[in-house]
Amino acid sequence: MIGLQLTYTPRMRSTWLLLPLLTAGLTLPGCVFDDFKDIGESFQPKSPMQAATDALDPYNADLRREGVVLLSTADFGGADVYLNMYRDYVEHETDPLVRAAAITALGRHGTTEDAILIVPWISSSVTDSQNIRWVAAKALQRLHNPEVVEELIRVLVSDDDDGEVKAAVAVALGQYSEDRVFQALLLGLDDRRLSVNVDAAQSLATLTGQEWGLSRTDWQLWYDRQADKSKLFAGRQDYFYPTYQRDKLWFEHIAFWIQQSYEQPSQPAGLAPKEKHRGTWDEPTLDDT
């Protein structure tokens, strides 16, 4: 009888070592296949029906928040039935993350009257949640209503130590061409946070058409030189609420098939343009040629 001598290559040895693991995987389908199912579901977006169902889940705040976010970022997220849900959550929701998502949604799809519903939430006397206060201030950048000016000013000039909220409030005030707003923004230039200074200066520039930087003294001198205060805002520029923008990363230039699109700055609901003006993000029309 001739004996056979088997020679094992490194590749064969590694295969034999993996065999017990593969066998265990086949004998434990409840673990392995469930894991693959979870991975697959993570790449499959939820349907509008599922998003709406999650947004109304009475037991799971995480699902409610996720559902609200998905609905509010969809094209149909401004339907009346969803607006009523956002408003209800702004008023009555107990989970701060769900309420913050609802405030953001209402800022995106709401009306000028909704600014009245949102404005109390920028105050530290109403909520301790910094996130809620910040998203409320951001939402008010998108909704124009002069009735909220007083509360915006109060937050900007208060002794509160929340710089992010104050900076967002300073941006929102850039919509309102009022003397009291000008004075409040001057105080914003003295804030110890640079972000508040920069946003206050930008709002002053939008309101007046002037460029005096971060110097409160220079802005005050310009103000004092204006004999007719009724013409203080004669050079006002159109206000556009800011949106998230970023440059492409290096691999996005290579992967040209990846299409990234971002929301473009626009004017708040309820704010009529000062005059016919083609903004930076508008397409040219026949009248412009």
Predicted features, each with a name:
Residues 212-258:
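Pro/Ala/Gly-rich low-complexity, hydrophilic intrinsically disordered segments
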Residues 67, 102, 136, 169, ...:
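Conserved hydrophobic register position within alpha-solenoid helical repeats
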Residues 64, 98-99, 129-133, 166, ...:
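Residue-level detector of extended alpha-helical repeat arrays and alpha-solenoid scaffolds
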